């Protein structure tokens, strides 16, 4: 059965690595130009002054109470050009108490102290954050190209990233959402590469990127639990593949003799050797996985200068019901104060955990109503973020994503109908298996489910912005409609 493919000789230019590299540079330069221009045209958002003041406080005082609900990586970077350019200070609005959010008042004080010049300071702070979006585009390109085995696939994913309105909107801002999308995608990409070919070098790169992702947004704390689960699933699929391969008798060689003591002993020795080798490999991978998680934790603490790291759990004052055990969110307390767990040191920076607690409090009780399609209400909708993505992404991108699922279904059918064929999706990228798609989809789907399950309030589609990068890597599969048509022989 022949499937419709577009056979255009011009598409072979993407087989040329130099031509592909030139196109990547052009797309990234165009993307950077759009972000740089937008940064000069749009006024600061409500959150940006607080983020910038937080970064300035990190550098000046080495403290992280301001805007603690977000880790400091984006703050650090955005503040650098402002420090170099010089600014007027006003720290009088700072205060700290359980549940305190001084960043908004302090952001207003910063604008008041710097007057009209604050617009220029926000502009250069925004420009400093542009590389985050460029890094995200590169990870899109590399993962798509490696997954689908095609330069064109990588270019499709990069194109979608570079001209995605939501990425363009947040990539120009002094906020952590685009950086979280980029580094979260990069961390999952490097972890997938480690799963395919484990090694200490790759494990080190994964651990470092995990730490950077954790320093962009607390949402990625889930990776500490997801990755061990994904690794176990990966091992299980490898085990099944070995069993399937061992049950297929060779067709071009005589059946080995199993009679006699010598033959039986030799077979047993081979089987034992394979078992020992496999066990050793699993133990090595497990050690590397532990190293990945520990290195990620180390980089996270390093980003905070180990500020309050390993504080005992009972020494915190929380405000969310999940951590206080109280009936009302916002009331200070600590449910672990009198428990055995309270004596355990927390391996996270103090302000990081306080930020998680404060964000959780907002999810439990939020004073402002939510809005969707002409309706205001206290609380939210489980489909709010799905609806937001549907109306905020271009129809062209949605059509390409729909074509991606069609492509996958077509080649799934094709691989299943091939005699003796394993469930391999793409003939020219025969290494792609269901576990690769699991590695691509597990993190974004988990993020989408977790955010959608917080029904106390629904605000800002940016909370699920990282989903787009993974979706556009998946969209690279559509490159296979542009392969040269194969002519049947015989």
Predicted regions and their residues:
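Short helix- or helix-capping micro-motifs
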Residues: 27-28, 157-162, 189, 210, ...
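Hydrophobic, aromatic-rich transmembrane alpha-helices
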Residues: 393-430, 487-488
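Transmembrane-helix signature of polytopic, membrane-embedded enzymes
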Residues: 20-25, 92-108, 140-163, 196-205, ...
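Transmembrane-helix motifs of polytopic, lipid-linked glycan transferases
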Residues: 127-147, 186, 190, 406-413
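Interfacial juxtamembrane loops and adjacent helix segments
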Residues: 65-128, 312-379
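Specific aromatic-rich, kink-prone transmembrane helix
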Residues: 139-143, 179-196, 209-210, 470-477
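Membrane-interface transmembrane helices that cradle and orient dolichyl/undecaprenyl
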Residues: 187-203, 232-238, 242, 247
